[in-house]
From Swiss-Prot:
UniProt keyword Cytoplasm, yes or no: yes
One example of a Gene Ontology biological process annotation: translation
Family of the protein in this entry: Belongs to the RimP family.
Subcellular location: Cytoplasm
Record's protein name: Ribosome maturation factor RimP
GO cellular component, one term: cytosol
NCBIfam families: PRK00092.2-5 (NF000932)
InterPro entries: Ribosome_maturation_RimP, RimP_C, RimP_C_sf, RimP_N, RimP_N_sf
Keywords: Cytoplasm, Ribosome biogenesis
Region (Disordered): 195-219
Function: Required for maturation of 30S ribosomal subunits.
Length: 219
């Protein structure tokens, strides 16, 4: 069993107003339901849960601070806190490795605010049903609205509309595409955030592409 770590009293639980619009299914959804309240209490937001067959079984929990940052120390705090909860709830059969990570630069887009925050950058979007004759889209995020996002294709192909409005409730998966512009913008945002922080804050670390803890074997 992993030692339980209590949230620091100075941490502010995350508000639930900006809930995820893309959610897990199956065992991933079960795990998300267990860990999301714990992660929120620590002052972080859950991005994604994914159980894969990597190294036997690997449970990846992706999280971030409300400002989009996540350091190795943050990942370790989340790991130490959720591990004992998972031990008690025991949602996964067999042994598995627990990995806590940041979203990285080419991050998944799981909230409405993610689309507006990264407007102007290229994303890949998949829908749960056929929309405008297809289920896969790629293009620049033009604007994120209350109930939809508009994508302008950067690779126009015959028969496909160059600009498509996609309702959020149809999106099953979405993530940013790694480009030079995205890297520059991500580093610029990270620098601005660090300069605005109180000196000594543990978030004043080097920008992280994908900060993560070492995986720990469970059971």
């Amino acid at each position: 069993m992993t030692e339980q770590v209590q949230a620091n009293e100075t941490e502010t639980p995350v508000a639930v107003a900006d809930e995820r619009i893309i959610r897990e299914t199956g065992i991933d959804a079960k795990v998300a339901g267990i860990v999301e309240p714990v992660i929120n209490t620590l002052g972080f937001r859950l991005v994604r849960v994914r159980l894969s067959g990597l190294n036997g079984q690997t449970l990846q929990i992706m999280a971030e601070r409300p400002d989009g940052t996540m350091t190795v120390d943050d990942c370790e705090l989340v790991s130490r806190t959720v591990a004992p909860v998972l031990d008690v709830e025991d949602p996964i059969s067999g042994k598995y490795h627990l990995e806590i990570s940041s979203p990285g630069i080419d991050r998944p887009l799981v909230r409405k605010s993610d689309f507006s925050d990264w407007a102007g950058h290229i994303a890949k979007v998949e829908t749960s049903i056929v929309h405008e004759g297809r289920k896969k889209f790629r293009g620049r995020i033009v604007v994120g609205e209350a109930d939809s996002v508009t994508i302008e294709s950067d690779q126009i192909s015959y028969g496909n509309e160059p600009v498509v409005r996609i309702p959020f409730d149809l999106i099953s998966d979405a993530r940013l595409v790694l480009t030079d512009d995205l890297i520059r913008d991500a580093l610029r945002k990270d620098k601005a955030l660090r300069e605005g922080r109180i000196p000594g804050d543990d978030l004043g670390a080097e920008p992280e592409d994908a900060a993560s803890t070492e995986t720990q074997e469970k059971k």
